[in-house]
Amino acid sequence: MTDTKKGSRLFMILNCIALGIIAMNLTAPVHEATHLITQMIAGAKPIVLAFGCAGTIDPSANIDSPFWKVMYTGSAALMNIVIGFILLIILKKFKLGPLSRPLVLMTTMMHFSMGFGYFLRDFFLYDPNPGPDVQQGDWAKVYENFDGNLALRITMLMIGCIGILFVFYIAYRQAFHFISDNNDKNERNRVASAIYLFPYLVNAVVFTLVELNGPVAKDNINSFLIISPIINIFGMIGFFWGYMFVAHMVKPRKQNVYYFSPCAEKKLVLWIFAAALLAFDALFLCPGFYF
């Protein structure tokens, strides 16, 4: 590989890592802001908005409505799914550009992964006999309002499984818009590692570390060590399997649907913006804004 090609591949990877950081900031804070807004509508007094959590319910608010008790814990995952479908329509209807398309694709996958992921994993996280304030997971808390109804939990588990498989499907299908020769395994590996593997690995490590400065970690490190890896590592596993399917495991698509490769030019402003956003997360958003 020539130095020019090595440089182009490095720039493609760095650009996609930066886009992955931006995509995460278009996903997790939206999830938490939905919690916050729903809690306020329900009549509760929010305490904090942070990258990894939002607004503990004020017990004095005395929310009696079963509907709002469910909504303030379950609505954020639903919002992720709705946004995911909106972004998927944008992906299908518009060609976008060599930077905007990977960004929209990553953000779509993250919203779907977060939304459907809660349905899937909270089936297992639900504790029928939790201690005070230790029920883990948004939808585990929803199930608590229905006394852990098994039929509801199984239904949501199935929806979650289908949703995560849908993320795998999106990852596989959409990747070929960036691959000019579907039969070139090296190109498939190069593109899939840039748009899926490296952003996944960097985000999983970086956001787990920066969230160590967040309210959940400070309040209960044991809870954090359960929740954060589940969300950042296992919750976004669609990126890893997207890479594996495209580069190694699944026979490539016969039909060529190539638009263009992800941007392989040096985008210093993009890198600086992503680094500044990450610094903002670490210094301000992860510790949280208190009301």
Range-by-range predicted roles:
Residues T73-L88, L157-F168:
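Hydrophobic alpha-helical transmembrane segments
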Residues M12-A18:
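Select transmembrane alpha-helical segments in multipass membrane proteins
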Residues I57-V82, M109-H111:
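Post-HExxH zinc-binding segment in Zn-dependent metallohydrolases
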